[in-house]
């Protein structure tokens, strides 16, 4: 209990200090602000709290901060008074401990003192109830350290009590109390608020009048000895006023001590119990106003809150157990990502990455590693497609599966992978589809049943690709990548392809076709005046995204059944165990780099020659391909143009697919590779090549 030193002959006036009350929502909002907005900024921030004068007996005078404390325009709860504060959030616990508390208190006290001297506190009495909040948020452990300060100016002289505090019902009649309630409510309604921190009172036996502080000269005109003021009082103690009275008495002494000898104070407490309003427990007392000589210097101030042990020190709250585990997981998942934006990559657009919807075709070694890396980047929407079941050889290389998943013939990979992602992080939207992808050279016309099943599989795949933003091709065979490559090219979806050899790998992005409504000569969205065309496209530099090749563009034969007449080591993907981890990680990093480029999938491809140049994005280069050689621990970044006779992305194939749909696809599935080669012109190319070789041989023989 804080006290003002009193005259030896009179009682001392004591005040009940505020007790801080911080809602869990405040700490959650501070966490979000720290991660997303404040980062390393330690500059003071404006915040807002409130206090209430209607609490039940026994509760302390609380200053409450909720999740809305950071929104200065947020409405104050009904029948509560606002309190304006300043937040000092430090970056380290050491900074929190060594912060100059005395200086912070003096700065806040000076602001209050200036508002008293200038008269702005009369216009806006909320300025008398400022507070400070010094914090440090340990976002790894969810430990929050804080120290409140409620600056209170100290008068140079004592504030002797002329009449000690008594209940309002001992000084006012029932009629006067009802008149006070009515007058207060009318004033609040006139001002458009539900509570007033301070107000003037004038009363006699028959009436009670109230007014705003700024009208004191007219309101008290003719009074010479005593004035009466009302204070919205959050304290419940019968003998002591709350903290908001302290700075008001300094204002009264500074401005009115030459005109009035004393101030009668009504500590207005407005409680509703069992549906009945009651203000009779308010207290009223009279204090003598000391003469306060004019001084430009701010009076001494106090106000730092004591901790739970009653000593001068900060408090700490541990929210790691009481916060919602799913919200904790979500915040923790994003923690490292958002820390990148603080200092290392301040221009990183995480929203583009987190919101992207990824379709993973293949839930094997590559699919598992890609999924884990996507989760590391905060991607929330991941869908698996696979038709295989988990075998005993899988769990050691495929990190989403365990030994139990192999029992009973094995769980479907796609469903098990999606289920495991949700167990790892409940906030992810993971789905699995146990389905086959029809392939060239793998006939589906054995019966009407197989043909209809293939039709359903194609329709399902088309719907999945349409509903996702990025498609990852992570299957075992080359021909299984053909159908999704065609569909994705037709739907203008970004495709990231990863394939493994024994000690080599390729990771690439497919060229992104121009939007269908644009002609061949039109520019791509956001593409700066066909920059690649102006610079001159070559095989090595300045190739824009719409001219890049796909996985099949370097082939001169159509994909077929690659598993026929193959031994076991040729049918299985036999590669060095670390290769899938490397390729899977690079596939995701390539996607993220593409998303960070302002032109997205239309970005000009970076090559090995660009490694010493200024990178096009905050994360670095945006290559077309990454080809790795683990035997040499080396990577190269080749770039290749789209092939006009490509069996997957050429205009002839896409036009045929868009016109005929499944009928065209069924021909590809049921025919040999010559069908696609005839369609695209590869057959003619082979014939021309053979003819050229014959002519070369003839010339040699002649010579």
From Swiss-Prot:
Glycyl lysine isopeptide (Lys-Gly) (interchain with G-Cter in ubiquitin) crosslink residues: 45
Compartment annotation: Cytoplasm; Preautophagosomal structure
Classification via Gene3D superfamilies: NAD(P)-binding Rossmann-like Domain, Ubiquitin-like modifier-activating enzyme ATG7 C-terminal domain, Ubiquitin-like modifier-activating enzyme ATG7 N-terminal domain
UniProt similarity note: Belongs to the ATG7 family.
Domain comment in the entry: The C-terminal part of the protein is essential for the dimerization and interaction with ATG3 and ATG12. The N-terminal FAP motif (residues 15 to 17) is essential for the formation of the ATG89-PE and ATG5-ATG12 conjugates.
Illness: Spinocerebellar ataxia, autosomal recessive, 31: A form of spinocerebellar ataxia, a clinically and genetically heterogeneous group of cerebellar disorders due to degeneration of the cerebellum with variable involvement of the brainstem and spinal cord. SCAR30 is characterized by global developmental delay, hypotonia, variably impaired intellectual and language development, ataxic gait, tremor, and dysarthria. Most affected individuals have optic atrophy.
Assembly with partners or alone: Homodimer. Interacts with ATG3; this interaction is essential for the transfer of ATG8-like proteins's thioester from ATG7 to ATG3 and plays a role in the conjugation of ATG12 to ATG5. Interacts with ATG12. Forms intermediate conjugates with GABARAPL1. Forms intermediate conjugates with ATG8-like proteins such as GABARAP, GABARAPL2 or MAP1LC3A. Interacts with EP300 acetyltransferase. Interacts with FOXO1.
Protein name: Ubiquitin-like modifier-activating enzyme ATG7
Top-level taxonomy: Eukaryota, Metazoa, Chordata, Craniata, Vertebrata
